[in-house]
Amino acid sequence: CDGWHLLKSDTLSVIQERMPPHTSEQLHFHQKTQQVFYILLGTATFLIDGETQLVKANESISIPKQVPHQIRNEQEEDLCFLVISEPKSHSDRINL
């Protein structure tokens, strides 16, 4: 993924990301951070606490803290999205 910080503070982070086709991030969770993903372009496949959900452009999904999750781009086009983290997720990521 390529990512650009739009806002970065101790209490809130907003990052715009681009995920190439047929890529994914590692399954993980955050101890203290809740997140909202807002899809700008494409369709994201999320694995959230063992359940798969599709999220399309102009839709969002909320991930509570301590819930295992993964985002995948199973499409033929780039996936672009915003990830909003409260508080910031830096150093609060546990890979599974």
Which residues are covered by each model-predicted region?
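Double-stranded beta-helix
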Residues: 11-13, 17, 72-96
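Short, conserved beta-strand element in jelly-roll/cupin
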Residues: 18-20, 29-46, 84
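Short beta-strand His + acidic residue motifs that chelate non-heme Fe in jelly-roll/DSBH
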Residues: 27, 46-47, 63, 69-75
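Structural motif
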Residues: 43-45, 52, 68, 78
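Short acidic-glycine-tyrosine-enriched beta hairpin
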Residues: 50-65
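Short, surface-exposed secondary-structure boundary micro-motifs
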Residues: 66-67, 86
